[in-house]
Amino acid sequence: MDPLGPAKPQWLWRRCLAGLLFQLLVAVCFFSYLRVSQDHATGSPRPGLMVVEPVTRAPNGSRCQDSAATPAHPTLLILLWTWPFNTPVALPRCSEMVPGAADCNITANSNVYPQADAVIVHHWDIMYNPSANLLPPTRPQGQRWIWFSMESPSNCRHLEALDGYFNLTMSYRSDSDIFTPYGWLEPWSGQPAHPPLNLSAKTELVAWAVSNWKPDSARVRYYQSLKAHLKVDVYGHSHKPLPKGTMMETLSRYKFYLAFENSLHLDYITEKLWRNALEAWAVPVVLGPSRGNYERFLPPDAFIHVDDFQSPKDLARYLQELDKDHARYLSYFRWRETLRPRSFSWALDFCKACWKLQQESRYQTVRSIAAWFT
């Protein structure tokens, strides 16, 4: 008998078993990959968006070779295609403005376009001629374009020309990829720093500062009816002068401020409320989106909504009642015991974009800005 004969069947059996185990391992890996891929594919991205592929380009244009070696918060290069309304702003360190953010290199120097990780395009500055003012047709691989607007759809032209251009949205709308509201409330870190309201300094009743006067607009029509029953001091073009630097001092003398928006759209709650009214410690009387929309950002007793009244005459009567009833008037300031208002700045908005880009690496395309925004 060949001394190797008895070992041959055992060797074959072990070889077959190893082959079966290898095939089983390959099958498990394949189905695990398939399941993950399906999970991503069957997610529910925001309407109008399409997830294309993850970003595979490292900061400033180089290809990623080893993802494990990439820092958690790489220094990103962000290009501002234009300054907002062509007005330069100071750019402080993002690490000092947004908790958890690392610093980004933010610049308006268009020469860095080929190396930029992202480009922020302010819609107002390109909307009158998008074909001439948009970015070059050749885009560096992985570069993300961010559509930015703080204006309402009523004041944004040629949105349809932007189909397929942008990867992220940035606006006052809470469903934007980068949410940049005009203002917000935040808790006091300790005792409120503001002194109690000095009611004796409120010597006037109702004010309104308006620069864009359109007689056929909803807010002007409402004012025309309201003033028949209540004295309203109007500041701005063709009205009482309001010298630069005196707005807060002037408006703080009033008990109420008409925070009337120039157009009525979801989440469009602007500096008319956050700055003109709340920073002046005046109770805002709002005309804009629904009360429910306001209550997403403010306590229900922090403002008065025109929709709460059947007519401007009824609103006028209510304001006159509050003027005489100090306790009821002061109830509109109770929320300030625990919360304080904050207002946006361009620099803060840019740093929010910086933080978002650090946190979110997926690459998507906004199919239609117009379909989402209007």
UniProtKB/Swiss-Prot annotation:
Protein name: 4-galactosyl-N-acetylglucosaminide 3-alpha-L-fucosyltransferase FUT5
Keywords annotated in UniProt: Glycoprotein, Glycosyltransferase, Golgi apparatus, Lipid metabolism, Membrane, Signal-anchor, Transferase, Transmembrane, Transmembrane helix
GO terms for biological process, alphabetical: ceramide metabolic process; fucosylation; oligosaccharide metabolic process; protein N-linked glycosylation; protein O-linked glycosylation
Protein family according to the UniProt entry: Belongs to the glycosyltransferase 10 family.
Lineage of origin: Eukaryota, Metazoa, Chordata, Craniata, Vertebrata
Major place of residence: Golgi
Sugar attachment sites: N60, N105, N167, N198
SUPFAM superfamilies: UDP-Glycosyltransferase/glycogen phosphorylase
Organism, as annotated: Gorilla gorilla gorilla (Western lowland gorilla)
Keyword hit for Transmembrane helix: yes
Membrane-side (Lumenal) residue stretches: 35-374
Superkingdom in the source lineage: Eukaryota
EC number from the UniProt entry: 2.4.1.152, 2.4.1.65
Function: Catalyzes preferentially the transfer of L-fucose, from a guanosine diphosphate-beta-L-fucose, to the N-acetyl-beta-D-glucosamine (GlcNAc) of an N-acetyllactosamine unit (type 2 chain) of an oligosaccharide, or a glycoprotein- and a glycolipid-linked N-acetyllactosamine unit via an alpha (1,3) linkage and participates in the surface expression of VIM-2, Lewis X/SSEA-1 and sialyl Lewis X antigens. Preferentially transfers fucose to the GlcNAc of an internal N-acetyllactosamine unit of a poly-N-acetyllactosamine chain acceptor substrate.
Catalytically driven reaction(s): a beta-D-galactosyl-(1->3)-N-acetyl-beta-D-glucosaminyl derivative + GDP-beta-L-fucose = a beta-D-galactosyl-(1->3)-[alpha-L-fucosyl-(1->4)]-N-acetyl-beta-D-glucosaminyl derivative + GDP + H(+); an N-acetyl-alpha-neuraminyl-(2->3)-beta-D-galactosyl-(1->4)-N-acetyl-beta-D-glucosaminyl derivative + GDP-beta-L-fucose = an alpha-Neu5Ac-(2->3)-beta-D-Gal-(1->4)-[alpha-L-Fuc-(1->3)]-beta-D-GlcNAc derivative + GDP + H(+); an alpha-Neu5Ac-(2->3)-beta-D-Gal-(1->4)-beta-D-GlcNAc-(1->3)-beta-D-Gal-(1->4)-[alpha-L-Fuc-(1->3)]-beta-D-GlcNAc derivative + GDP-beta-L-fucose = an alpha-Neu5Ac-(2->3)-beta-D-Gal-(1->4)-[alpha-L-Fuc-(1->3)]-beta-D-GlcNAc-(1->3)-beta-D-Gal-(1->4)-[alpha-L-Fuc-(1->3)]-beta-D-GlcNAc derivative + GDP + H(+); a beta-D-galactosyl-(1->4)-N-acetyl-beta-D-glucosaminyl derivative + GDP-beta-L-fucose = a beta-D-galactosyl-(1->4)-[alpha-L-fucosyl-(1->3)]-N-acetyl-beta-D-glucosaminyl derivative + GDP + H(+)
